[in-house]
């Protein structure tokens, strides 16, 4: 009987000790497919363009056109693009993502560095890249808040912040 009580107490003690130990969640396994350039070309740029073009004043020979989302469908479309832009910034910050495919050139003629050179600069100062990506996240989040409030002026102001962050 004494032995049973002792084993029971030992078992309970081991159980409690293991319960007190913080369980670490498994590290997520990311399967990176797209490069930073791919994300910029397919998610960031097109989404930012939709936000910028959704609120505008266009003056031409035929007159002045005020562009604003008007219907729930218009607002939903702009919202989808804002969410894409916000979440794309998280993808940009994921570790080990390649800048571009080897030998792939930017369409911007002002970018003279090879992808490997850009990647080295980025990896040498990861904090700067994270800060830039977070700035875009913050600006796009302001746009999303304006869209959720159906505030065209707020979206216009947020568009300027997105432009500055880009």
Regions found by a protein language model. Give the residues of each.
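Sequence context surrounding c-type heme c attachment/ligation sites in exported
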Residues: 21-79, 83-86, 90-165
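C-terminal motif of bacterial Sec signal peptides marking the signal peptidase cleavage site
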Residues: 17-19
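Bacterial N-terminal signal peptides that target proteins for export
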Residues: 1-10
